[in-house]
């Protein structure tokens, strides 16, 4: 497995993975409004635009197939984090690579936040995040605000 910054032209593969995992695991618990809101966020053109601004995306690859992705906004917020097959170490490796990328860019590790899907809370807790508030809902998307301290 190799982890690299997403390159121009790879956005379609990234979004295909994101949508496949979302459809299988997260969408069944969302309202129609929530699914539509997420699909609007997880569009190739929107990922391209975010990448030109203050986001970066890392992709875990195996034989030219994406295994997982993590998108970081403003060096302090996890925007998207999806792994095709959980409990194989891909998520942990992606997260560690994202932390190294942040350190490389700013010289230290900022505190991080995430709006975790309900089923992802235990995974984020294993990565050192803690719950900051109860379940929130915005535009049909249910999430738990979580944070992790910096260095």
Predicted regions and their residues:
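A short, internal acetyl-CoA/4′-phosphopantetheine-binding micro-motif in the GNAT/acyltransferase core
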Residues: 81-89
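Conserved GNAT-fold acetyl-CoA-binding loop/helix
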Residues: 19-45
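Conserved acetyl-CoA-binding loop-helix of GNAT-fold acetyltransferases
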Residues: 88-101
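Conserved catalytic-core motifs of GNAT/GCN5-like acyltransferases
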Residues: 113-115, 130-145
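Conserved beta-hairpin
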Residues: 54-68, 73
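A short helix-loop-beta-strand connector motif used in the catalytic cores of GNAT acetyltransferases and
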Residues: 42-58
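A short beta-loop-alpha structural element at the N-terminal edge
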Residues: 2-16
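Conserved GNAT acetyl-CoA-binding A-motif
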Residues: 102-119
């Amino acid at each position: 497995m190799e982890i690299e910054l997403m390159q121009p032209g790879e956005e379609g593969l990234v979004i295909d993975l994101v949508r496949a995992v979302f459809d299988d695991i997260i969408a069944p618990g969302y309202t129609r409004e929530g699914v539509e809101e997420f699909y609007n966020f997880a569009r190739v053109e929107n990922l391209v635009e975010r990448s030109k601004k203050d986001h970066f995306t890392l992709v875990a690859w195996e034989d030219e197939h994406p295994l997982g992705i993590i998108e970081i906004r403003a060096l302090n917020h996890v925007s998207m984090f999806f792994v095709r097959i959980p409990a194989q170490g891909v998520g942990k490796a992606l997260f560690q690579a994202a932390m190294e990328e942040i350190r490389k860019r700013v010289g230290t590790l900022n505190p991080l936040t995430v709006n975790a899907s309900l089923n992802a809370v235990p995974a984020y807790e294993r990565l050192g995040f803690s719950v900051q508030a109860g379940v929130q809902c915005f535009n049909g998307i249910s999430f738990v605000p979580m944070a992790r301290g910096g260095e």
